[in-house]
Amino acid sequence: MKADIHPQYHETTVTCTCGSTFTTRSTKENGAISAEVCSQCHPFYTGKQKILDVGGRVEKFERRFGRRQPGQKVGGAK
C-alpha cells in the first residue's frame, strides 16, 4: 500500500438541529459537522411520526405553481 495517499482523520463533533451531539472521525478539517436529523430525533428510531419538511418545500411548490382543483386542466398545448 502506498504511503501518504490517504486523507487524515480528525475527531469531529456532529451537532443535530434537535440539540444532540456525538463525536466521530471525519476527513473534514474544522472538527464540526451539522446535521438535520440524527438517531435521537429521526422518526424511524424514535417510533414517532414527525414531518421533516426542510425549508417548507411543499409551501414553496404551492406558492410557485398554485394548488389545482379537482377537474382543473393543466395549461393548453402550444
From Swiss-Prot:
Cofactor(s) the protein needs: Zn(2+)
Entries under InterPro entries matching the protein: Ribosomal_bL28/bL31-like_sf, Ribosomal_bL31, Ribosomal_bL31_A, Ribosomal_bL31_sf
SUPFAM superfamilies tied to this protein: L28p-like
GO molecular function term, any single one: structural constituent of ribosome
Cofactor note: Binds 1 zinc ion per subunit.
Pfam families per record: Ribosomal_L31
Example GO BP: translation
Signal peptide (from-to): none
Highest taxon, organism lineage: Bacteria
GO cellular component: ribonucleoprotein complex; ribosome
Protein residues bound to Zn(2+): C16, C18, C38, C41
Entry keyword Ribosomal protein: yes
Keyword field: Metal-binding, Ribonucleoprotein, Ribosomal protein, RNA-binding, rRNA-binding, Zinc
Its biological purpose: Binds the 23S rRNA.
Assembly notes: Part of the 50S ribosomal subunit.
Family recorded in the similarity comment: Belongs to the bacterial ribosomal protein bL31 family. Type A subfamily.
Protein name per UniProt: Large ribosomal subunit protein bL31
